[in-house]
Regions:
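ATP/NTP phosphate-donor binding region
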Residues: 1-86
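Glycine-rich beta-strand-to-loop/alpha-helix junction loops that act as flexible
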Residues: 59-60, 90-92, 233-234
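Non-catalytic interfacial helical region
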Residues: 73-90, 99-114
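Short glycine/serine/threonine-rich phosphate/pyrophosphate-binding segments
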Residues: 94-101, 122-123, 240
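A glycine/threonine-rich phosphate-anchoring loop and its flanking beta-alpha core
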Residues: 101-194
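C-terminal charged capping/lid subdomain of soluble metabolic enzymes
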Residues: 171-173, 270-342
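Active-site segments that bind and position negatively charged phosphate/pyrophosphate groups
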Residues: 186, 191-294
Length: 342
């Protein structure tokens, strides 16, 4: 077991890699817990939550709405939540977002923590203090920065994941390697298949490295004014693909990373040899690299991304593995790249 700390403006977050949800009472007074649990997780792990008050928050992106938050807050009232209550989000990124957002606004803020049950949430969504919901199809456009008190990373919870969910987490791990950990990238080239098979030592290695990298970045830029923007590598296009093409987050991130990599090559920032290594790893893991949606539809959706400012869109590109650079694309440049590279 490995423990990491993230010191944020809203408090310190304790991230325990290799923890067990069975030991939740060691981290918070179990008598004051209300769990906000993903529907599928609640069904699969009912024995782990049976001793707690809990609320079913649904599943999937459709659950991340203000209407859902309103219903959850009513249930918190019904269950007698007060300012001594600790909310625990149990599930993937959606459940963590919902739990963090609801806890942050209920009674002007309750303490909360996460027990992420997907690989993606364990390496990314549960760490960093971003908690948001969607509006009119636009992801995480409403949200807060607020650090969870704890994140319990229990590898046993991954055993019920379908292959597509494991792949989604692998995409985020590749992202972390590309923006800040060349050694992990090389490890994935040799051991990516072992990660997908959830071999314990491979999971421990990459989850620990991914969590440490994200903590390092968030610690110096909690509110995403500079360094933290690098974590958006591959995600600007990915969010648009999820909306227009109806594909999974992991698939969209794979395509988004390849798009950004190809722009990097086209701009002369990245060598062809490195571009080929990146594509080989993405395809080797089973992630798609080619974009299926129409360029025109993607352009309109991407251009509404919340990362746009002053007539240009911030885009994270690469100079090398582990060397990201934040640049800006105007609408004409983006349109040209979507036409030429997709």
């Amino acid at each position: 077991m490995r423990e990491l700390r993230l010191a944020g403006s809203t408090g310190s977050s304790r991230i325990v890699i290799g923890a067990s949800l069975k030991d939740l009472g060691d981290y918070v007074d179990s008598r004051r817990i209300i769990m906000l649990a993903d529907s599928n997780v609640a069904r699969l792990h009912r024995r782990l939550i049976s001793g707690y008050k809990w609320v079913d928050v649904g599943s999937g992106e459709k659950a991340k709405s203000l209407r859902s938050i309103e219903k959850i807050c009513r249930r918190l009232l019904d269950l007698g939540a007060d300012r001594s209550t600790t909310v625990v989000g149990l599930g993937g990124g959606v459940a963590c977002d919902i739990a963090g957002f609801a806890a942050s606004i209920f009674m002007r803020g309750l303490g909360f923590g996460f027990a992420p049950t997907t690989l993606l949430a364990q390496v990314d969504a549960a760490i960093g203090g971003k908690n948001g919901v969607n509006l009119d199809g636009y992801k995480n456009i409403l949200g807060v920065f607020n650090q969870p008190r704890f994140v319990l990373v229990d590898f046993d919870l991954l055993q019920t994941l379908p292959a597509r969910e494991i792949l989604g987490g692998a995409a985020e791990i590749v992202k972390h390697a590309l923006i800040g950990d060349p050694e992990m990238f090389a490890y994935l080239e040799e051991n990516g298949h072992r990660l997908l098979a959830l071999e314990r030592d491979a999971v421990e290695e990459v989850v620990g490295r991914s969590a440490a990298l994200k903590i390092k970045i968030v610690s110096v830029d909690e509110r995403e004014t500079d360094e933290r923007r690098k974590l958006n590598f591959g995600h600007t296009l990915a969010h648009a693909l999820e909306k227009t093409a109806g594909i999974s987050h992991g698939e969209a991130v794979g395509m988004g990373m390849m798009f950004a990599t190809r722009i990097s090559l086209a701009r002369g920032l990245l060598s062809g040899a490195v571009e080929r290594r990146i594509e080989a790893l993405i395809r080797g893991l089973g992630l798609p690299a080619d974009i299926p949606a129409a360029a025109g539809l993607l352009l309109e959706t991407v251009w509404k991304d919340k990362k746009r400012e002053a007539g240009a869109l911030r885009f994270v590109l690469l100079e090398d593995i582990g060397k990201p650079v934040i640049t800006k694309l105007d609408r004409k440049e983006l349109e040209r790249y979507l036409h030429d590279l997709c």
